[in-house]
Amino acid sequence: MRHTAAVGGFDVDVVVVGSGFGGGVAALRHAQAGRSVVVLEQGRRIAREDMEAGGRNLRRLLWAPEAGLSGYFRQSVLRHVVVVHGVGVGGGSLVYAAVLLRPKPEAWTAPGWTATGVDWAGELDPHYAEAATRLGVETNPYTGAQDRWLASAAEDLGVRQTFAPTPQGISFDDCVRCGACLSGCVHGAKNSVDRTYLDAAERLGAVVAPRSKVRRLQRLRGGGWLLLVVD
C-alpha cells in the first residue's frame, strides 16, 4: 500500500526503515516504480578507513552506544542464538561472509512448505536469480587447508557429496583472500547492499539518510504516517 510519510520536514511516498538486505530491495523496487523514497538508517556510512580501524580495534568495530561504542558490528545474545547485525548503510551485508546458498529442491517438498499449496520453487527461483545477478554471485575458485579439512570431515561422516565450492557475492578478481569479510571488506571485493541495491536506488532518486533512528510512528488522519526521527 502506498502512503505518504513526513520525514525531515518534507513528504515522500515511501519511507524504508533500515538499509540492509530487506531495506535495500524495498528501496530499489519502489524507486523503480517511480516513487519518492527515503531510507532511514541509524548507523553511518561506513568508509574503508572505518573498516580498517574496525579490523584492528574492537572499540572501533563494535556498536554498543550504551558503552560509548559507535562502530558498525553488533551482537545480540538471545537464549538459543547469537544474532550478528550490521549498523551502517548496508546493514547486515557489511558484516557477513557473502555466502549466498540457495535451498536445494528437496527443501521445498518438506511438509511445512507443501501444505500451503504454493509452488515455492516456481515462485522464488526468479527472485533468487535476480538477487544473484544484483549481488554479483561467483563461485569461490580458491581452496586451501581449511577446505581440505572440511572435505575430509565430510568424507568421514559419509556426506562427501555435501562438500562443494561456495557461491558468494564477491568479485574474486578483487579479493585478496584476507579472510576479513566479517569486519568489512576494505578491498571493495564484497558486493554489499550499499554498493548494489542502494546504489541503484540512489541513482533513481532515492535518498539514504544515515544517523536517522526512528523513535515513533504516528498514523495521520488524512492518510499516511508521521515519523519521529532522531540523530
Regions found by a protein language model. Give the residues of each.
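Conserved redox-cofactor binding core of oxidoreductases
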Residues: 112-214
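Short low-complexity, flexible loop/linker segments enriched in glycine and/or proline
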Residues: 52-56, 178-182, 223-226
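Short, solvent-exposed loop/turn segments at the edges of secondary structure
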Residues: 87-90, 176, 222
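Conserved beta-strand-loop-beta-strand element in the redox core of flavoprotein oxidoreductases
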Residues: 216-231
